[in-house]
Amino acid sequence: AWVTSDSLTFIGVIGAVLFAVGGILAHIDTKFLWLASLGLVINWYGDSLDGTLARVRRTQRPVYGFFIGHTLDALTTCLICLGLGLSPMMRMDVAFLILAGYLCLSIYTYVCTIIINEFRLTYGKLGPTEVRLLLIAVNTLYIYTPWSAIHYNIYGRNWGLFDIIGCTVAAILFMFYISQFTKDRRALALKDPAKPWHP
C-alpha cells in the first residue's frame, strides 16, 4: 500500500539517472554499461506501472497524471541521451540528434492527444519499450564485441560504428515524424478545410 503512482514515477527517473551514471563510468570499465542497462529496466518498471497502479486502485488523476508523467518523461529522455553522449560509446552531437528526434515524436504525440484525442505510444513498431530494448542490445554489443574499435574517417571527422548506428536511429525517428505528420496533415486539412477569404 505504501507504493504510489508518484513513487513509481520517481523510480523511473532514478532509472534514467542510473543509465547516465553507468554511461559515464563506462570510461573506466565498459562493464559499467550493465549498470546503464539496469537503469533502463528500472526506468521501464517505474514508467510502465505508475499509470497501471492508479487504474487498478481506481485512483486515476487524469490531469495531474498526464502533467507529471510526461514532463518527467522529457527529463528522463534527456538524462538517457546525456548518458549516451557522455559514454565512450557515442559522440554527444549524435546523442543530441537522437534526443531531438525522440522529443519531436513526443511533442507530436501530445499535440495529437489534444487535437484528435488519440494518444500514440508507438510509431511503426517502435515504442518506448522497444527503444529501451534496443539500447540494452547496443550496450551489450559494445561490451562483448570488437565493434567499439571500428572507426571511419568521414569528411575529416572520426565516426565510430556506434555513432553511425546512432545517426541511423535518429534518421528513423525523424522519418516516422515526417511520415505521420504528412498523413495527419492531409486528414486534418479535409476535416478542417481552409475558409475562403473575401477582402
Residues covered by each model-derived region:
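Hydrophobic alpha-helical transmembrane segments
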Residues: 1-37, 83-199
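Acidic (Asp/Glu-rich) catalytic motifs at the cytosolic membrane interface
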Residues: 32-82, 108-112, 182-186
